[in-house]
Amino acid sequence: MLTDLLKWGGKRSETSSRGAEGASERDEPIVASKAFPKFVATLSQKESPVLLDLGPVIGSNVGFCGERLGCKLFIEDLLADVDRTLRGTAKTDLAGSMPTRFAHRDGSIDGILCWDLFDFLDKAAAQALAVQIVRMLRPGGAVMGFFCTSAVERSPFTKFEIVDDKTLRHRNHPGVGGKKVSLPNRDILRMFEGLVVADSFLLKNNTREILLRKKILATPSESEASASAATTPAKT
């Protein structure tokens, strides 16, 4: 498995324009996102955040993450793994490979971009990946994913190119595509046990954009203060 790591210096206030170049020359749709601006805002509050992208390498996305967020970026192209599985050329079972797929330490990632990856995973693979996402995510961190609201017998893969912090270009992907599975909200919450839904948006194309957050654990002193306040009678 190939992991691409890119380290950038400081943040820049201006958004990269590389993702928007040549937009008029393409017929690929540009779609406004509701969750992505909130995901960006969450990471912007952190100094040198660590970001994990589960999609393919896209140059303009790398540029945006470096220039806009000043982040350390890891790219783990799980869509390529799914493509190999559907083609019948995968060497390992997708669900079984998840526990060893990621070398990242527990609680070491500030943000994870899942895109629509979960739509193409079977139940076992989806659950195994969700466990790893919860494990790797740092308290206060965010996860963004797109989930279809109805099953599709066959759908092409999509590459999501960041145009700016509010819009994404839906680009064609050369993979074979596959069946899309619709996950009920309760199943998503159960899968990501330990995370909470910070925001959920239903778009006109019937895609649910979901932003999940990991709660920040209270420090021992904060816990003691809270317990003390709860047991101290109020003055009248």
How would you describe each model-predicted region?
Residues I112-L113:
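Hydrophobic beta-strand segment of the Class I
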Residues L117:
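Hydrophobic adenine-recognition pocket in adenosine-nucleotide-binding enzymes
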Residues F120:
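A short His-aromatic
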Residues M1-L43, L51, I58-R101, A142-T236:
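Class I (Rossmann-like) S-adenosyl-L-methionine-dependent methyltransferase catalytic domain
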Residues Q127-P139:
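A short glycine-rich, Lys/Arg-flanked "PGG" loop and its adjoining helix->strand segment in the class I
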